[in-house]
């Protein structure tokens, strides 16, 4: 189970079939809300073709094993997480393509604040560019590459997800290359030019957001003005009637 892979925890005891039958969807939702602050914290990776009725039973068994464990988890209590953990799943599709995902989770030794998040974001932008150049553009057989760094403020840890699609027989080769690229970027760090490019991109995004918010605010204000002035509505209705038809 992914829970056993991503978290070093002793609460994943399998249930008997009669216990699974008693575990409802509402119970599963309650357990999920109790354990995880975000839906992104829980991931199901299904390898191969599984019938829907079997899949539901598997997920129910998974959540039920947490809910009915001998050591229940109190609400708000953090999970016992592995300090460094990675898992790789290769999933065959209808076409001869493999999806490869690798999770790495690290304990955060620095405060989780805005500065930390922006530094991680800047690093991930540079890393993602390295991965695209070295895996997708230079190494044949890889079709898409994505890199994502995220911070969990409650657990105070950092997780990194690397994912790409490639030819099934080459996923080990591509994964090795990806890890080499990440090690080089960690050693190199971020140059001043890369940091400036990141800052410019962030500023452009903020400018676009600010303009969008301003346009929305203007629309709301204009609507309120018309709402308070019935004459404005009457004038618009008269103009609509006078519009020519074709």
What is each stretch, according to the model?
Residues 1-20, 39-47, 98-117, 132, ...:
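M16 family metallopeptidases and their MPP-like homologs
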Residues 38, 43-108:
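An aromatic/glycine/proline-enriched structural segment found at the starts
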Residues 59-63, 123, 175-183:
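Short amphipathic C-terminal alpha-helix that caps PH/PH-like domains
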Residues 33-36:
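Surface-exposed acidic, glycine-flexible loop patches that form ligand/cofactor-binding
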Residues 16-19, 31, 58, 122, ...:
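Short, hydrophobic/aromatic alpha-helical segments in well-folded domains
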């Amino acid at each position: 189970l992914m829970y056993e892979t991503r978290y070093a925890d002793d609460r994943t005891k399998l249930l008997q079939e009669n216990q699974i039958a008693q575990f409802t969807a509402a119970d599963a939702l309650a357990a999920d809300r109790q354990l995880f602050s975000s839906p992104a914290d829980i991931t199901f990776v299904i390898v191969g073709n599984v019938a829907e009725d079997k899949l539901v039973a598997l997920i129910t068994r998974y959540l039920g094993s947490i809910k009915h464990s001998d050591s229940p988890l109190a609400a708000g209590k953090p999970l016992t997480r592995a300090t460094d953990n990675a898992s790789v799943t290769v999933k065959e599709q209808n076409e001869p393509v493999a999806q490869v995902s690798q999770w790495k989770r690290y304990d955060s030794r620095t405060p989780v604040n805005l500065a930390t998040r922006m530094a991680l974001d800047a690093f991930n932008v540079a890393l993602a560019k390295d991965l695209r150049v070295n895996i997708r553009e230079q190494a044949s057989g890889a079709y898409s590459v994505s890199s994502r760094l995220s911070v969990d403020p409650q657990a105070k840890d950092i997780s990194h997800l690397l994912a790409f699609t490639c030819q099934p027989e080459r996923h080990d080769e591509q994964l090795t290359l990806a890890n080499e690229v990440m090690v080089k970027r960690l050693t190199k760090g971020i140059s001043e030019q890369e940091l400036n490019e990141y800052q410019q991109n962030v500023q452009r995004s903020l400018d676009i957001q600010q303009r969008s918010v301003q346009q929305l605010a203007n629309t709301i204000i204009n609507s309120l003005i018309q709402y308070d002035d019935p004459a404005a509505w009457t004038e618009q209705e008269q103009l609509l009637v006078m519009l020519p038809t074709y």
